């Protein structure tokens, strides 16, 4: 996907259409959040400009060699402890390593590796965050599950710790809509933006699945 066109561009179109068709005053909106495809990998520069098209979740299987490389590096038993299964094309770690191995010039320019929802949130607020589910599951084992901080020794063969977004809960406030984002989306400047999450999590909440056992 072209993140600037397909993700951010379409988000702006949808946001403006919703506001226009609903007649809701943007200043009355208490908070907004984005959901998007899950374990994507999008490298961006310091201005949050995409450095290449996003590598999508399981349907993009280009990182087969990197999965083999990581399995040999860590051992299948250790990987099973982390994931409960072998590595697969849905995991972000092999995608980052693929960029490092095959597009070193892009890797060198990368400020952050983002998912779809974290990219939209960054475009709205200027802050780089990822929700706990995506951070701990899709980027496993690069974050410590107890502290939510990147683990330097595990990141070292893959990426720098500072290339990863900050983990927050999906409903935590990530920041406020910037002046530029307000002009592009029609939202009011200063509107709170939550961290957001992946599509399946948001779909569950929207259908009323909010308690254990539902």
Locations of the language-model features?
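Short clusters of small/polar residues that mark proteolytic maturation junctions
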Residues: 55-56, 133
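N-terminal glycine/serine-rich phosphate-binding loop of ATP-dependent small-molecule kinases
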Residues: 1-53, 65, 81, 109, ...
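Short glycine/serine/threonine-rich phosphate/pyrophosphate-binding segments
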Residues: 36, 202-204
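Carbohydrate-associated surface elements
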Residues: 60
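Hinge/lid segment of periplasmic solute-binding proteins
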Residues: 64-75
């Amino acid at each position: 996907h072209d993140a600037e066109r397909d993700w951010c561009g379409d988000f702006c179109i949808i946001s403006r259409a919703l506001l226009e068709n609903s007649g809701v005053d943007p200043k009355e909106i208490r908070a907004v959040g984005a959901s998007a495809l899950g374990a994507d990998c999008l490298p961006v520069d310091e201005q949050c400009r995409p450095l290449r098209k996003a590598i999508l979740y399981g349907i993009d299987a280009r990182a087969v060699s990197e999965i083999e490389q990581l399995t040999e590096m860590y051992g299948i038993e250790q990987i099973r402890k982390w994931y409960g299964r072998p590595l697969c094309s849905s995991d972000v770690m092999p995608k980052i390593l693929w960029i490092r191995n095959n597009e070193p010039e892009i890797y060198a320019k990368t400020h952050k590796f983002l998912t779809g929802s974290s990219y939209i949130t960054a475009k709205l607020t200027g802050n780089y965050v990822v929700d706990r589910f995506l951070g701990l599951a899709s980027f496993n084992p690069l974050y410590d599950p107890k502290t939510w901080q990147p683990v330097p020794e595990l990141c070292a063969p893959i990426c720098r710790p500072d290339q990863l977004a900050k983990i927050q809960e999906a409903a935590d406030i990530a920041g406020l809509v910037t002046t530029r984002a307000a002009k592009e989306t029609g939202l009011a400047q200063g509107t709170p933006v939550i961290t957001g999450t992946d599509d399946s999590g948001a779909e569950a909440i929207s259908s009323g699945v909010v308690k254990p056992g539902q």
